[in-house]
């Protein structure tokens, strides 16, 4: 798992992620607000959101090679606030994940990692 600090709030970071995905024509399949869900059952949680997105063209090819990777797809980025009020993004290490499924030689894995890093760097204002 990769963790990277954001200069913005959870809501602003998530909004920036959504804008980037929209500009790249990458579909968003779901968004979860864990803090909101916790409040609905009377529990407290620091801001914590997850966005689920990806390209069926890419994911399908991986699942054709090993259907078990479907548990990892579509791609996800979590944006959360720690107990000190610092905001973080978390996203998978695709190369490690791919090796668990025998897919480390698939060229798309590196591209998926680059995409995740690009989205996170731009949304957190940590452009490299």
Question: Where are each of the predicted segments found?
Answer:
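Compact, glycine-rich, soluble single-domain proteins
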Residues: 29-78
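Well-ordered alpha/beta subsegment
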Residues: 100-128
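Terminal, regulation- and interaction-focused segments at domain boundaries
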Residues: 1-26
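Short polybasic/polar patches that bind polyanions
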Residues: 22, 39, 99
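Short secondary-structure transition/capping segments
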Residues: 72-85, 120-128
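Beta-strand/loop substructures that line and gate deep hydrophobic ligand-binding cavities in soluble
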Residues: 77-102
């Amino acid at each position: 798992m990769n963790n990277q600090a954001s200069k913005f709030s959870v809501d602003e970071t998530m909004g920036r992620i959504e804008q980037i995905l929209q500009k790249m024509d990458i579909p968003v399949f779901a968004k979860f607000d864990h803090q909101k869900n916790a409040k609905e059952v009377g529990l407290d949680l620091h801001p914590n959101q997850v966005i689920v997105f990806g390209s069926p063209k890419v994911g399908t090819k991986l699942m054709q090679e090993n259907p078990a990777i479907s548990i990892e797809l579509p791609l996800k980025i979590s944006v959360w606030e720690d107990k000190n009020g610092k905001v973080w993004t978390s996203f998978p290490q695709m190369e490690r994940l791919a090796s668990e499924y025998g897919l480390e030689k698939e060229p798309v894995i590196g591209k998926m990692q680059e995409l995740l890093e690009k989205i996170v760097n731009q949304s957190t204002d940590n452009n490299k």
